[in-house]
């Protein structure tokens, strides 16, 4: 499999879908959004974007399977696309310009290709395993911040699982007191890419799904970040927790997360 050649095709499919989303946002109204679950919105834009992505990706890799947020299930195979057609739907619905397309390719349990396109800013992040990370064709690296007190931290809040709310509050209090600040962007894929290019220095969140992190985590890793689950292991893709930072900060940053959150399986 020539991943470099495949990446070129994926970037094109994602860019075309991003243009569709930008066009639809101009005429989009709140009434077009539907409630998928507690605090969880979906729209025809999510669904149509997923259809466009699936169609384009199947043309590139006909033998692939799919795991996608809006329900596309083509049976898991040796090569599987993990897709969020519109990460940050609530931002999109409310006109907040931070939402992204996330496409990761999994091979035998490992993410080997990732593309995240932040639609409103028209920024496309990408990576392949052992190939570095890029933003609009330029190589990117994580920041070099050495001290927690000089760092900017990104996180997300739970929308339908509040079992670890005390952990959320514990971590927030610590980082509010001991960093430059906390940013809650509202799209995990964008958070991870912001880490990859040095806009933030660390990211953590719990209760995530594979399509939230598949592409962004690979991009962050290829940009030099350390990425683990909350236990410090490799279960971030399916384990529903993720923490990531530049290597210099990781020891102290991860200690805060592990002290704040308890009773994690």
List each language-model region with its residue ranges.
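An extended, acidic
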Residues: 141-265
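Residue-level signal for inorganic ion chemistry
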Residues: 21, 46, 57, 89, ...
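N-terminal subdomain of lithium-sensitive/metallo-dependent phosphomonoesterases centered on the IMPase/IPPase/PAP
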Residues: 1-86, 226, 234, 248, ...
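Small-residue (primarily alanine) positions within well-ordered alpha-helices
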Residues: 10, 14-17, 114, 133, ...
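A short, compositionally biased
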Residues: 28, 99, 127-131, 221, ...
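Solvent-exposed alpha-helices and their adjacent loops that cap or buttress functional pockets
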Residues: 34, 74-75, 108, 126, ...
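Short, isolated positions in well-ordered beta-strands
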Residues: 112, 139-142
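DPxDG-like acidic metal-binding loop motif
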Residues: 76-134
